[in-house]
Amino acid sequence: MAFGTDPDGTHRYRATATWSGSTGAGYDGFTRAHRITAPPAQAALELSNDPSLGGDASRLDPEQLVLAAASSCQLLSFLAIAARARIDVTGYRDDAEATMSHDEGPARIAAIVLRPRITVAPGPGVPRVERLVHLAHQECYVANSLATPVTVEPTVTFSM
């Protein structure tokens, strides 16, 4: 559930980023480790920077969170659409990938590719499931919010 929902239906979300340390020793001397909380969730995310930029590889970084948000939104949008269409989804795994561009201009995530492998109970044909995957992509609010193109390349299999 959102942090709050206005009477007009607008959802509001909040997050708090906290860091402590010192940048007094220069660029190479400060910790990138920080924490994100987002009420009402109780769990905090322990984050860092990309290891190539001095971060801790054992922690997630912001770029991974952007990718994870796109993947999670696609998953949840698809499951909702499949359930409404009475399609029995029995498995879903997305091996998603983002690429960072360092061309001219500021660095940015240049592309996100979602590769969901979806298992469904026998019944619907592959084309129907693929149409629902693409409909879910059109309805995914995270993908719709990003300036970066998000591509979905589904694979559909049937459970026994």
Model-based region annotation:
Residues 1-68, 76-160:
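Extended beta-strand/beta-hairpin segments
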